[in-house]
Amino acid sequence: TAECLKCPVMISFEDSLQYRGKADKYLEDGDIIDLDGETLKIAKTPGHTMGSVCIIAEESKTVFTGDTIFDTDLGRTDFKDGSEAEMIRSCREVIDKWPNDYRIYPGHDESATMKQVRTYNSEFLHCLEV
């Protein structure tokens, strides 16, 4: 918990509606967070949930994607506040803009470069085609 780690709780407002604790900050698209000299940029990527976000560290070419996108598939959209249409929009308007040398780190499973994602993730490629 935040008390144990002595750090602020940051979450999107949409996802906070299911969170039992108190948020210190609601994350918005484009927010910038300074983490000991590393600049983190928030990108809203609804689809898995309406409040899904990815955290981009441009200096290290790293993206923490949570359950939005994985090396070979996308996050589930069959939850109460998930949306396949929003996932498609997130893939087209946000994720597809990340350079090939950026490495994604999902909430679980393997990391991958965006070049690998563009090669092996058929669900992502399908979103770009529809």
List each model region and its residues.
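Metallo-beta-lactamase
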Residues: E3, T39, M50-E129
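Hydrophobic alpha-helical positions that pack around
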Residues: T45
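Active-site HxH/HxHxD metal-binding segment of metal-dependent hydrolases
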Residues: T1-E38, Y120-E123
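Short gly/pro-enriched beta-turn/loop segments at secondary-structure junctions
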Residues: E28, T49-M50
